[in-house]
């Protein structure tokens, strides 16, 4: 809830979100209480990475045509994805998003929006290693601005 960016990943276009997400997990220090992401993270490799990292609560909506990975009669611990899928089947996707805290993900979208408003939508350097350095410097600056104080926001009726 600090509104700070904890990790960043710049990748080539051929890298999927779940693969980039694994890198973000590795680059994040300390305990991770909750991961929220859109359906593009609904892949085994990402769930396995969150399990290895010890993430307590995983809020990723399974794809609409998703199937259970590990059935309920298994002696193994239930998979978080399967628990999410079962709950969605019980109460519906919309209610699941409210119940699970899925909308916390909008804080990430807001941070990315702030980044783009302040620094623009493009990077100035040409090579990927330099772009990563440029993005890291900008993230440090944005986090410092965030630490100095977020604007007061309120609803206008």
Q: Which role fits each region the language model picked out?
A:
Residues 1-56, 62-63, 116, 137-139, ...:
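Polybasic low-complexity intrinsically disordered regions
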Residues 18-19, 44, 67, 75, ...:
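Intrinsic disorder/low-complexity detector
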Residues 1, 5, 30, 87, ...:
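General secondary-structure edge motif
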Residues 90-157:
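Basic, amphipathic alpha-helical segments enriched in Lys/Arg and hydrophobic/aromatic residues
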Residues 29-30, 71, 81-83, 136-138, ...:
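Short, intrinsically disordered/low-complexity patches at protein termini
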Residues 36, 61-62, 127, 151:
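Short loop/turn and capping residues at structural boundaries
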Residues 1, 26, 65, 73, ...:
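Detector for Asparagine
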Residues 41-113:
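Helix-centered, glycine/charged polyanion-binding patches within enzymatic domains
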């Amino acid at each position: 809830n600090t509104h700070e960016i904890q990790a960043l990943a710049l990748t080539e276009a051929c890298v999927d979100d779940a693969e980039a997400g694994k890198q973000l997990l590795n680059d994040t220090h300390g305990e991770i209480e909750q991961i929220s992401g859109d359906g593009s993270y609904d892949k085994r490799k990402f769930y396995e990475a969150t399990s290895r990292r010890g993430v307590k609560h995983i809020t990723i909506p399974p794809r609409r045509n998703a199937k259970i990975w590990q059935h309920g009669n298994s002696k193994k611990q239930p998979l978080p994805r399967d628990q999410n899928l079962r709950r969605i089947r019980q109460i519906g996707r919309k209610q699941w998003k409210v119940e699970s805290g899925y909308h916390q993900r909008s804080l990430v979208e807001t941070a990315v929006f702030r980044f783009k408003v302040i620094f623009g939508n493009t990077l100035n350097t040409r090579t990927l290693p330099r772009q990563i350095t440029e993005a890291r410097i900008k993230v440090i600056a944005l986090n410092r601005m965030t630490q100095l104080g977020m604007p007061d926001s309120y609803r206008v009726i």
